[in-house]
Amino acid sequence: MIKRLDSKYEKKVIDYLNIEKEINTFNLQELKNYGFDNVFYKVYSDIDEDGNIKGILFKCFEYLTFYSYGEFDVDKFCEFIISDIEFNEISGKTECVEAIARKLGLLKYRKVHLCRLDYIDDIEKNINPNLKLKKINIFNIKKVVKLYEEIGEFQNTTIESLRSNLKSGRGYCIEERKKVISMAKSTAENDNTAMIIGVGTHPEYRNQGLASK
C-alpha cells in the first residue's frame, strides 16, 4: 500500500535512492534539508508485504517528484495521486514519469538531460580574459531573469524561484555592457555531490566557452 513515510524509514529510503544517486541528488538533498516531518514536504511510498520500497513519491508544495528503481505499480500510484494530491507538475526519472503521464493523460512535457561530471579538462582556452565571473546576488538577479526570458529552453523563471534555488547552491554569471550574457548555477550541494543547473548563454554570445568558464 502507498503511505506517507516517517523518519523510521530514513535509512531504507536513502539506501534506495543511492542505488542511482546521480539521478537522486536533488531528492537526497531535499530529504536532508526538510526531513519527513514537514508541512510542505512529504514522502510517500508503496511498501510491499516484506517491507520493500516499490517507488517513492516526493511532494514539495505543488510539485511532485517520482522515482522507482525497477518495476512499480503505475495504476496504484496514479489512483493515489488523483484521489489524494493536488499538484501542478511532476518530474523525475524519464521512464517512470512517462508511464505516470500516460495513465493520467498529461500531454505537455519537457525532457532534460542529466550528465555526470567525472573530471574537469582545460576549460580556459579561447575565453576572453577580460570577461569576469560575478556571483548572482540581489544586485544582478533581475538581469539574470532577463537572460532566462531570452532563452527558449527555460520556462517561467521568476526572481522568487531563482532566490529559492540559490538557498541550496550558488550561481555565477558573466556581464558585458551591463547585460548578463551567460550563467550557471548549482543546487543540492552537499559534501559529496552537487547539481549544475540553469546553464545558459545568450544566443548572440554562444560557442565562446562562456558557460564553461
Task: Tell where the protein language model's regions lie, with residue ranges.
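Short amphipathic alpha-helix that is part of the acyltransferase structural core
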Residues: 1-26, 120-156
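Acyl-donor-binding surface of acyltransferase catalytic domains
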Residues: 53, 60-129
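Acetyl-CoA-dependent GNAT
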Residues: 58-62, 153-193, 197
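Conserved acetyl-CoA-binding loop-helix of GNAT-fold acetyltransferases
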Residues: 72-78, 201-203, 207-213
